[in-house]
Curated annotation (Swiss-Prot):
Coiled coil, from the record: 591-682
Reported function: May be involved in podosome and invadosome formation.
CDD domains linked to this entry: PH1_AFAP, PH2_AFAP
Protein's UniProt name: Actin filament-associated protein 1-like 1
Record's compositionally biased regions (Low complexity): 139-148
Originating gene: afap1l1
Domain of life, per lineage: Eukaryota
Organism: Danio rerio
Record's keyword annotation contains Coiled coil: yes
């Protein structure tokens, strides 16, 4: 019985379409066996369908389930002769001018492309069923040349394809028609939604690759290398292991990861990441990052991983944990990162290096580990810029600012961006410099008189301070920690002259412990700034002043040594106390006002202590006298009187012991006051005016006390001192000093 070729051809086409539809359905075992039997019969019938040597039927499942050939013929209502061939084929075959008959819907499908696949030709294998050939999803990125050949996998593809003939001349199985090949999905953000993917049935000759045999899913995916580069590799999931091959010709994988021991995370593409990523992480190991083309493809791989590891079967404790809500968490972290990056934008060269075209540069390490906090970034910036710091100049008044609470690095809000500057508070003004130790004029100066300091600037900046003047914000500062915030708060409150107490301010967005740290630091810095001499330090170089003072002291000593003894006995109208460099370096650089006030205060304390000590000594003399009298009476008293006298003596002894303890405490305190007085006199030049009236005993006594502590450089001056000074300095200490000098002289 002769079979018509056209009905038979139509039957084969429809059966192939039916088989393709059944491939995507869930079938029973019996139906699956029947389907495989029909498919095997079709393979045997296909070579004898037409008079040609071999007819390859190219079928595909479109998104709506219809045949690729049928949908193509319904869409394109034109002659196949209108499809142009490449110019190279026309040169090789000049006899291509021939007539082409108009095809019908029952004609054979169009030929396969005959151009080599592009460089980044992309394939993805559909999970295999028993006896079913693998299917591949092909795509190409626009960035690669159209005629490049993939290494390894595609070198022999042209030889494996049979030749076909469709209504005319014989051709190779490849064609240059891009309409028949699938469009691509670009990795670029703006081309994510381009194109649609088509599934092609490849001939059985292509199934001979060893890596893809018996695999659940396979594809050429991009793998991230150590330093951020991407390399294309054949990735296969076989049994419960993830394997990567550098080439499809390799027999053994160079990366083999057990899926039952690793966690899988899907990271979607966003403004920072240019690719959809799958991260396979082993406990205590590095992450294997693979790039997929779309979210759908990532979900397909995740579904296969779940099936392989047992999560798809509803196990209670999956061996390969999947982190829930990872996408939402990454989006939230990304938004927080972008906000913090814009808030903590660095300045200078670092800003130009970090930000380019409005997007931050990120390396491979930062992409794997995420972002760092603003404080850590600020510390890293300081470490990097440590070697760039300028050495102190010879004329610099202070070689180090680290111990001055009024100086330090602080974040400043400039044009809605936070920049780090070196700040210094001095003379009621806030000076902002680009770097520490700059000698130039500060680029910003803020007057602090009459301003108000308010802590806090929202939940993202809990350690910020706002400086308000007349209700308007003139500056916004941000410290790196609670201690720095308290230090700056206390200094600014003192400089602004505000009556607000650091503990009475309202602190938002910080816990109780942090508030306690802020208040403690603010109280200390406030007390330091409001002390007697916090704002009277010399801000000028002091070494030259020391040399000048030494020269003046030597000249004045020579002049004084030539005076007569009668001149030295007279009180001078004013007493000038010189400043000595050795003591000044030891006790700090004091200003003139600070030295005068400290000297007066210590002199007054010294007088009060000496008066109190004298009263205690007088009381002790009286108590000891009573005790001696009581003991004398005990010798001639009766027994009853002795008991009463013994109790009286005991009480007197206790009183003497208490008084003696008080005297010792006051003596120690007096010694400390005298030491402080020496420091204050050595720290600055003091002029104590005395009135010309000889009856004013207080100022005369004050002058005598101060003169007693003058440094003596000449033995003749020591002998010229009046007896009153010797009387005031008598004691065990002076006696021992004199004995030591006499021993040293002999």
């Amino acid at each position: 019985m002769e079979i018509n070729s056209k009905p038979m051809e139509l039957l084969v086409t429809e059966l192939n379409m039916l088989l393709k539809l059944l491939d995507h359905e869930t079938l029973s075992c019996a139906t699956e066996e029947k389907k495989m039997a029909v498919k095997n019969l079709l393979r045997q019938l296909q070579p004898s369908v037409t008079a040609k040597d071999y007819m390859y039927v190219n079928t595909s499942v479109y998104r709506n389930g219809t045949s690729f050939v049928e949908s193509l013929f319904e869409t394109f209502d034109c002659d196949l002769g209108d499809l142009k061939v490449e110019m190279e084929d026309q040169k090789k075959e000049p006899e291509a001018n021939h007539t082409v008959t108009k095809p019908s819907k029952t004609d054979s499908p169009p030929p396969l492309p005959n151009t080599p696949p592009p460089e980044d030709y992309y394939e993805e294998a559909v999970p295999l069923s028993p006896g079913k050939m693998p299917e591949y999803i092909t795509s190409r990125s626009s960035s690669s040349p159209p005629n490049s050949i993939e290494d390894g996998y595609y070198e022999d593809a042209e030889n494996n394809y049979p030749t076909t003939q469709v209504n005319g001349r014989r051709k190779n199985s490849y064609n240059d028609s891009d309409a028949l090949s699938s469009s691509y999905e670009s990795y670029d953000e703006e081309e994510e939604e381009k194109g649609q993917r088509l599934t092609h049935q490849w001939p059985s000759e292509e199934n001979s690759m060893a890596p893809v045999r018996d695999c659940h899913i396979c594809a050429f995916l991009l793998r991230k290398k150590r330093f951020g580069q991407w390399a294309k590799q054949l990735t296969v999931i076989r049994e419960n292991r993830l394997q990567c091959y550098k080439s499809s010709k390799d027999q053994s994988p160079y990366t083999d990861i057990p899926l039952s021991l690793c966690s899988v995370i899907y990271v979607p593409k966003d403004g920072r990441r240019k690719k959809h990523e799958l991260r396979f992480t082993l406990p205590g190991g590095e992450a294997l990052v693979l790039a997929v083309q779309s979210k759908e493809q990532a979900e397909k791989w995740l579904h296969v991983v779940r099936d392989v590891t047992g999560q798809g079967n509803g196990l209670d404790s999956p061996s390969s944990p999947m982190i829930p809500k990872k996408i939402e968490l990454d989006k939230w972290c990304s938004a927080e990162k972008q906000t913090s990056d814009s808030d903590s934008m660095p300045s200078g060269e670092s800003a130009r290096d970090i930000r380019e075209n409005g997007k931050p540069k990120r390396g491979a390490l930062s992409e794997l580990t995420g972002t760092v906090s603003r404080a850590a970034g600020r510390k890293i910036t300081r470490i990097i810029s440590f070697s760039k710091r300028k050495p102190p100049l010879p004329g610099d008044s202070r070689s180090s600012f680290d111990h001055d609470p009024r100086c330090g690095y602080v974040g400043v809000l400039v044009n809605r961006c936070w920049r780090e500057h070196w700040c210094r508070v001095r003379a009621g003004s806030l000076y902002l410099y680009q770097e520490k130790g700059e000698q130039r004029v500060p680029h910003t100066t803020v007057g602090l008189k009459g301003c108000e300091v308010v802590p806090g600037l929202g939940p993202k900046h809990p350690f910020a301070l706002r400086i308000l003047k007349g209700g308007a914000e003139v500056a916004a500062l941000e410290a790196s920690c609670s201690e720095d915030m308290g230090r700056w708060l206390g200094v600014l409150l003192a400089e602004t002259g505000s009556s607000a107490d650091p503990e009475s301010l309202h602190y938002d967005y910080v816990d109780v412990e942090t508030i306690a740290n802020i208040r403690t630091a603010a109280r200390h810095s406030f007390l330091w700034a409001t002390s007697t001499g916090s704002r009277t330090y010399d801000e000028v170089p002091f070494e030259t002043e020391q040399e000048n003072e030494r020269l003046r002291g030597r000249a004045q000593t020579k002049r004084r040594s030539s005076f007569s003894s009668s001149d030295t006995g007279k009180p001078s109208p004013q007493i000038t106390l010189k400043r000595h460099g050795s003591n000044a370096n030891q006790y700090g650089r004091y200003g003139k006002t600070r030295a005068q006030e400290d000297a007066r205060r210590y002199l007054k304390e010294k007088e009060d202590l000496e008066t109190e000590i004298d009263s205690i000594r007088t009381a002790l003399v009286a108590l000891r006298k009573k005790k001696r009298e009581a003991k004398e009476k005990m010798k001639s008293a009766t027994d009853k009187q002795k008991l009463a006298l013994e109790e009286c003596v005991t009480k007197l002894e206790d009183s003497c012991r208490v008084k003696e303890g008080d005297r010792v405490d006051l003596e120690l305190k007096l010694t400390q006051v005298k030491e402080n007085l020496k420091k204050s006199l050595a720290g600055g030049e003091m002029e104590v005016p005395t009135e010309s009236k000889p009856a004013h005993k207080t100022q005369r006594t004050e002058a005598q006390y101060m003169e007693s502590f003058l440094p003596v450089n000449c033995a003749s001056e020591m002998r010229k001192r009046p007896p009153s000074i010797y009387a005031s300095t008598k004691g065990n200490v002076m006696q021992k000093a004199k004995e030591w000098e006499s021993k040293k002289g002999t």
